[in-house]
């Protein structure tokens, strides 16, 4: 089915069919922030060294399973999805190297959602810069570009990263190792702070810091998706 395009009409969403719409949405989903191949779940130890060869195809689920999930969501009364993706999912291999397979997968997922009567709000998600700094979003090659070794962030106390702290063999919730929702502490840790400072204020605080012939700020902003 082709859903009517929604427009803003005062306090309402109004479709091109003239009807008013109330959107009832669900988040889909948290695991879109990490790779599907290899499994990027945050309870699995990694130093992220293979960040250029990951794949997000299959997040939040394989296309073959999408119909089952979408039909359930419709049956439960939902008509809107907040569908997550990240900069890393699209451009993890390097500058201007876009993962065409992932983009094809993501587009197909959106078309299927439309077939099941689900509107899609695409959330280009980012938390505390990237997976390497305890969150998600930016690809790892940006650290290479500015000369930061993300494999040393945890040891240096520059980031609070679950992949280094969680004991996979022990399993379960581990409040002693990684208390729930403490990823947000990375807003005050150096690795995240350095990257955002370079991104928004590099020309002010370090105007002579050059990356491939450009100021660090200009380099980061020109590459941002």
Model regions and ranges:
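N-terminal module-boundary/linker segments of secreted carbohydrate-active enzymes
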Residues: 1-22
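Active-site mouth of glycoside hydrolases
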Residues: 20-23, 28-225
């Amino acid at each position: 089915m082709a859903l009517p395009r929604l427009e803003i009409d005062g306090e309402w969403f109004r479709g091109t069919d003239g009807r008013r719409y109330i959107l009832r949405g669900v988040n889909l989903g948290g695991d879109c922030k990490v790779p599907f191949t290899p499994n990027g779940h945050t309870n699995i130890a990694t130093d992220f060294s293979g960040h250029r060869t990951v794949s997000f195809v299959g997040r939040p689920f394989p296309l073959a399973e999408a119909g089952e999930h979408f039909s359930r969501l419709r049956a439960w009364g939902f008509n809107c999805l907040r569908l997550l993706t990240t900069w890393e999912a699209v451009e993890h291999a390097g500058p201007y190297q876009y993962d065409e397979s992932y983009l094809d997968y993501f587009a197909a997922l959106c078309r299927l959602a439309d077939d099941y009567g689900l509107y899609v709000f695409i959330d280009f998600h980012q938390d505390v810069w990237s997976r390497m700094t305890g969150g998600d979003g930016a690809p790892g090659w940006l650290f290479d570009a500015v000369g930061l070794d993300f494999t040393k962030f945890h040891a240096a106390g520059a980031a609070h990263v679950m992949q280094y702290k969680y004991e996979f063999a022990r399993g379960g919730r581990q409040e002693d190792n990684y208390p729930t929702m403490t990823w947000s502490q990375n807003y005050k840790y150096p690795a995240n702070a350095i990257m955002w400072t370079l991104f928004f204020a590099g020309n002010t605080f370090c105007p002579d810091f050059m990356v491939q012939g450009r100021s660090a700020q200009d380099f980061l902003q020109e590459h941002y998706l």
